[in-house]
Amino acid sequence: MTKPRILAAFAMTLIIPVAAMAAPQFFNIIDGSPLNFDDAMEEGRDTEAVKHFLETGENVYNEDPEILPEAEELYAGMCSGCHGHYAEGKIGPGLNDAYWTYPGNETDVGLFSTLYGGATGQMGPMWGSLTLDEMLRTMAWVRHLYTGDPKDASWLTDEQKAGFTPFQPKSSGEDQS
């Protein structure tokens, strides 16, 4: 083999795996049907965070201190009634530890799919109540409330895991973000 062919073959071994990485797939957590994002609100579809998430499955809002105050408000208004103020669980399951009623929720793609498409019981789909961007922000707040060992938090990057402190509620009146 000539040197140019060897270099070309080597280059292809680097290019093909990158090209083979497909965008994440989103399915209804209950029936397995593909989620239809045409149902989503128009507002909040084209943010950089949403575009990045739909291409990679990575929520750039996770542990972003700038969005946490708004994320807390979204969670308080849409989720805390069932899941508890600190995601400790009420009539809905707890969301702040390493146990997931739907194991797919351990990933951001899975949690997003549950938010978007709904789950069993009283957890209806959120596509008519939250924008796609608001869903990502709400997910970031849920992830922020995590009380477990950071090594088990698959949604965090290695860098985020190194600096992550498990959530502990502060005394009444203190900012939780």
From Swiss-Prot:
Keywords assigned by UniProt, alphabetized: Electron transport, Heme, Iron, Metal-binding, Methanol utilization, Periplasm, Signal, Transport
Keyword Transferase attached: no
Gene3D superfamilies according to UniProt: Cytochrome c-like domain (1.10.760.10)
Keyword check for Iron: yes
Signal peptide (residue range): 1-22
Induction context: During growth on methanol.
Gene Ontology terms, MF aspect: electron transfer activity; heme binding; iron ion binding
InterPro entries noted in UniProt: Cyt_c-like_dom, Cyt_c-like_dom_sf, Cyt_cL
Location of the protein in the cell: Periplasm
PTM notes: Binds 1 heme c group covalently per subunit.
Positions annotated to bind heme c: 79, 82-83
One GO CC annotation: periplasmic space
NCBIfam families from the UniProt entry: cytochrome_MoxG (TIGR03872)
Role description: Electron acceptor for MDH. Acts in methanol oxidation.
Name under which the protein is recorded: Cytochrome c-L
Organism for this UniProt entry: Paracoccus denitrificans
The organism's taxonomic lineage, starting at the top: Bacteria, Pseudomonadati, Pseudomonadota, Alphaproteobacteria, Rhodobacterales
Gene: moxG
